[in-house]
Amino acid sequence: MLLLQIVVLALIQGITEVLPLSSTGHLALLPLLTPWPSPTTWPDQGVALDVAVHLGTLGAVALYFWRDEAAMIGGCLRLLKGKRDPGARLAFLVVLGTLPAVATVLLLAHFAGPIASPGLATIGWTTLGFGLLLGVIDRLCMTVKRVEHMGGIDCLLIGLAQCLALLPGVSRTGVAMTAARLLGYERVESARFSMLLSIPAIAGAATLVGLDLARVGQSAMAPAALIAAVTAFLAAFLAVAAMMAWLRRHGFGPFVAYRVLLGAALLALAYLGPDLAPFLVS
């Protein structure tokens, strides 16, 4: 891959992995809007770059929420000494919220086998539909709860909602934030818990892809992987910081509007044909 392609892919995946957007939608649209050397020959990023981007994004989220992570680690250590601690409770919630997605992935891997690549129309409809759902719920639902108020039922419901992200175009962070807002959690708290849930989710994805890398071996990709990891780290960190700052004073409106536009673009390409791509980039 060209250096510019690596940077563009890392930027897109780093940003869309943490924002309530659709990484699948962007990656589906990318080959049509950036014809290097032609829309039909956009290269596969490869396993090594996939691992690198996941690790870069994971590092960004872990760095931004280091206080929560320190509290969870310290709380678990104090719990081992017989002392109850809010940090240990938060760690329990993160583990509990992750279990539905883990169970779903294992069940699908065992019973369903490989899943066919989705079409543009599917990605477009899910990007658009779940974006509108986030907008409606964000506007209509209460804003009273914090993560400290979260019980096991709410946590499991948010975790179950994450399973919908297995549908391409849904966005894991987006659907988790939507579920949290539906349950009455503050915007910042919804984003915060979604980001904490993303740590085991991204780590798990990186581990699975890393196992593939260990089997096939791509050591020659080390310089490119380093560039991808650093780019994804910077993009994800800035994206998380900007989102959290925005949500302290505003709602999810800009993210909803962007998803509607992205979904509309994907649907236009799906139903009117890729011949529209030159008009979108001109």
Curated annotation (Swiss-Prot):
Keyword Membrane recorded: yes
Transmembrane regions: 1-21, 46-66, 91-111, 117-137, 150-170, 193-213, 226-246, 260-280
Top-level EC class: hydrolase
Coiled-coil ranges (or none): none
Assigned keywords, A-Z: Antibiotic resistance, Cell inner membrane, Cell membrane, Cell shape, Cell wall biogenesis/degradation, Hydrolase, Membrane, Peptidoglycan synthesis, Transmembrane, Transmembrane helix
Keyword Hydrolase (UniProt): yes
Gene Ontology CC terms: plasma membrane
BP GO terms, sorted: cell wall organization; peptidoglycan biosynthetic process; regulation of cell shape; response to antibiotic
One Pfam family linked to the record: BacA
InterPro entries assigned to the protein according to its UniProt record, in alphabetical order: UppP (IPR003824)
Chief location: membrane
EC numbers for this chain: 3.6.1.27
Membrane-topology descriptor: Multi-pass membrane protein
Localization of this protein: Cell inner membrane
Reactions catalysed according to its record: di-trans,octa-cis-undecaprenyl diphosphate + H2O = di-trans,octa-cis-undecaprenyl phosphate + phosphate + H(+)
Molecular-function annotations in GO: undecaprenyl-diphosphatase activity
General remark: Bacitracin is thought to be involved in the inhibition of peptidoglycan synthesis by sequestering undecaprenyl diphosphate, thereby reducing the pool of lipid carrier available.
UniProt function note: Catalyzes the dephosphorylation of undecaprenyl diphosphate (UPP). Confers resistance to bacitracin.
Protein family: Belongs to the UppP family.
Name under which the protein is recorded: Undecaprenyl-diphosphatase 1
Organism whose genome encodes this protein: Rhodospirillum rubrum (strain ATCC 11170 / ATH 1.1.1 / DSM 467 / LMG 4362 / NCIMB 8255 / S1)
